[in-house]
Amino acid sequence: TLNAVSSYVKQFLPDNTIFVWDEKPVYKPNIRKETLKEYKGNRSKDSSPHQNNEVIKSILKTMGINSIFPSQLEADDVVAYICREKEGSKVIISVDRDFLQLVSEECTLYDPIRKKYFDYASFEQETGYKNVDEWYTAKCLTGDKSDNVPGIPRFGAASVKKYLADPGYMLDKSQQEIFKRNADIFCLDKYESLPDEKEYYREQLEVKVEASYKEFIDYCKEYSFERILSKKENWYNLFFMKSLYNKLNDIAS
């Protein structure tokens, strides 16, 4: 994970890096399950892939990287909040196609597995849909198997194409109900109707995380991250030089 973060920071050279986790230190039930109780019921309950999360969070903090969490919602919603509330260009690094709905002139999605960019200019070329609205409509029609959200029965690619091409295409009552339910599940602006959730995100983002090269090296020694230690100068230049420069600027001002 740390090497991946390093490679992305080197690739994109951001002014600020935020790590969003899909876990809940302040737990509240996922409100999407109120709409569909089977939502994500197909996901593995195996916690072993997350056993080192606390160590990773601590090390990220020494690198000046803030960790942000949801409470009632999910990591996707936190990312949506950041993209919509923060000014300037943003790059989301994720394989999750749900983030396609956030693509805009200021927001790009980068898939690190396929090494593909999804941006405003190339959206149709990369997705086959003219714009984000078309993509989102198609998703609401067809559902999402990975999230255990069923779509409209027998509504495949041909039906979606016909629906998008014909403004007069009418869904029947049961189809409308499925579409509306899916739109409610998939939308990433639910935080707008949850003031406490929105405030929770804002408070976390306001926390200033100071990078500490000494603490970073101490962690790397403690956990025998020999590969990082062998290239510690590179890590210093990438994460800690900027922090030192910012501190000097603060003093000067």
Which residues fall in each region the model found?
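Extended two-metal-dependent nuclease catalytic cores across DNA- and RNA-processing enzymes
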Residues: 41-230, 239, 243-251
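Domain-level signal for Mg2+-assisted phosphodiester chemistry and nucleotide/NA-binding surfaces
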Residues: 1-61, 114
